[in-house]
């Protein structure tokens, strides 16, 4: 008799296999990072990771700005500002960079907790690239800080880099992620 797949409800107590009809249109839309300096973060996410700025929203009365970054084709975005907001919020897997005004020039500002030191919480986001090793060579040449290079550790072929605020980003490609996870699959 064949073993139940790891994803089956019998192997995952609490798992509901038939989503509630009310959740049919839900998507994973964004992860939010608080950033110290938008100039530095926008450079990293656009130049280093190749993302586009999908939409910027400024809230002067609350003194913060939101920058929505992603891999969408911005030429497809509507030109009407409100329609562009709706378009942005309908895209899958975007990064919302939240800048509280003044942090970039505040010498007392210590930065944000990235979740990877005690107390641990949030860990990282992941970006699929064409070739992990080539991408990491490029990141190295751009001066990006590494947490783990693809040749390090037991999980060969995946890397972790840091963004300017210390958030971790896992870097992998379709081939190496299959090799790395084959014994766990």
From Swiss-Prot:
In residue numbers, the region (Disordered) covers: 1-21
Q: Which keywords, in A-to-Z order, does the entry hold?
A: Lyase, Metal-binding, Zinc
Q: So what family is this one in?
A: Belongs to the glyoxalase I family.
Catalyzes what? (R)-S-lactoylglutathione = methylglyoxal + glutathione
State the gene name recorded for this protein.
Answer: GLXI
Instruction: State the organism named in the record.
Output: Glycine max
Q: What does this protein do?
A: Catalyzes the conversion of hemimercaptal, formed from methylglyoxal and glutathione, to S-lactoylglutathione. Active toward the hemithioacetal adducts formed by reacting methylglyoxal or phenylglyoxal with glutathione, homoglutathione or gamma-glutamylcysteine, showing no preference for homoglutathione adducts over glutathione adducts.
Q: Remarks, anything else? A: Zinc ions may be required for the correct assembly of the enzyme but are not required for catalysis.
Q: What NCBIfam families does the annotation carry?
A: glyox_I
Q: Matching PROSITE patterns, A to Z?
A: GLYOXALASE_I_1, GLYOXALASE_I_2, VOC
Q: Coiled-coil annotation: which residues?
A: none
Cofactor field: Zn(2+)
Q: What is this protein called?
A: Lactoylglutathione lyase
* Cystine bridges: none
